[in-house]
Amino acid sequence: MSKTIMDVSRWQGTIDWDEVKASGKVDGVMLRAMGNSADGKVSKPYIDPQFARNYAECTRVGLPVGVYGYFKAVNREQADKELAYFKKLLTGRSFELPVAVDIEDEVQKPLGKAALTGLTAYMLSTVESWGVYALLYTGLWFGNTFLCMGGAALKPYDVWLAAYRTRKPAPGWPFGMWQYTGTARVPGVSTNVDMSHAYKDYAAIIKRAGLGAVKGV
């Protein structure tokens, strides 16, 4: 049986997490920790304004938490800067769900499949080295067009696939989570919200493996 996972960011405003928990509609939450205003030339990651509150509140009410960062890196130097910033945001916190690298930006398209796939694999392996369960987030069209999905470089990592439709997609490569809508409604959230099916019990897997806590260097 799949788990229902909600993901939120600053765009959902101030959430009443007691209401979310009481609704019984959500088994876990993916929080945006890092946004990005990079233009392809200069890396400009920033903390999502709601991240600290959302993390504290989810922890308080007992909702399993994962996190994602929006990456716009187009080379290794930018990737290292964004990764360092992302890790700083996560250090000292623990996550029951995966830590996702979000790859879907316009500035990354000109790199070509091979280069962007290699850069993405590098970012995922770095995140994994922090002692968390690394996950790739991307859209169905973006993944098929700009990444070598199902290839050797990305094969070690689960995919969180965005494809808004009523039937489960069949892209020809495996994925562990499916973000199926951006217009769900959940008590306690004043806006539409993204919702996903998780086909693995990530909380159990992460706990069993002793993963999830991000420590400083």
Functional labels for PLM-detected ranges:
Residues 1-19, 23, 27, 150-217:
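Functionally critical loop-and-helix segments that line ligand-binding/catalytic clefts
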Residues 1-130:
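Substrate-binding cleft of extracellular glycoside hydrolase catalytic domains
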Residues 37-38, 74, 143, 168, ...:
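Flexible, glycine-rich phosphate/dinucleotide-binding loops
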Residues 43, 66-70, 100-108, 136-138, ...:
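Low-complexity, flexible helical/coil segments
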Residues 46, 55, 68-70, 85, ...:
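Sequence-level detector for tyrosine residue identity
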Residues 97-171:
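Catalytic domains of cell-wall/extracellular-matrix polysaccharide-remodeling enzymes
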